[in-house]
Amino acid sequence: MRHGVAGRKLGVTSSHRAAMFRNMAVALIKHEQITTTLPKAKELRPVVEKLITLGKRGDLHARRQAYAQLRDDVIVSKLFSAVADRYKARNGGYIRVLKAGIRHGDAADMAVIELVDRDVAAKGQDSGPRPEAAAEDSLAA
C-alpha cells in the first residue's frame, strides 16, 4: 500500500526526475511560461514556488540553496532581483497551471505553466549564449 506517499514518479528514475525539474525550473524562470504535460506541470509548481520564496528571502544562504538547485548564475540572479521584487507583496501562489488540451501524438494532457504577473517580453527569449557574453568575447579577441 502506498498510503501517504506524495509525488509522482513520472515513469523515470529519481536522478532523471531531479534533472528534469532542474531544467524545467530554469526554463520557467527564464521564459516565465512553458508548455509541458499536466502531471509534470503540477509537480513543478511547488519546486518553483519554493525557489521564488528563497529569492524573496534574499540572503546569502538562500542564494546558495537556489544555486544548488538551479546551477545557473544568470537565472539565480534573475530570481533574486527581478522575480523576487515582483512578488514581494504576494504570499505564495506565484505559479499558474492552465490546461492546454491534448497532445496529438499520444493524447497526453498538456498544460501551460506560467508565473503570475509574468513579463510577456521574456517568453521566447534566446536560449543560446547571452548577448553580453558574446560582446565581451568579441572585445577580448
UniProtKB/Swiss-Prot annotation:
Keyword check for Ribonucleoprotein: yes
Q: Which domain of life is it from?
A: Bacteria
InterPro entries named among the record's database cross-references: Ribosomal_bL17, Ribosomal_bL17_CS, Ribosomal_bL17_sf
Q: Which residues form a coiled coil?
A: none
Q: Which GO terms describe its cellular component?
A: cytosolic large ribosomal subunit
Keywords noted in UniProt: Ribonucleoprotein, Ribosomal protein
| Zinc among keywords | no
Give the GO molecular function terms: structural constituent of ribosome
Q: Please give the biological process terms from Gene Ontology that the record holds.
A: translation
User: Which is an annotated Pfam family here?
Assistant: Ribosomal_L17
Q: Which family does it belong to?
A: Belongs to the bacterial ribosomal protein bL17 family.
Q: Partners and quaternary state?
A: Part of the 50S ribosomal subunit. Contacts protein L32.
The record ties this protein, via HAMAP family, to: Ribosomal_bL17
This chain's protein is named: Large ribosomal subunit protein bL17
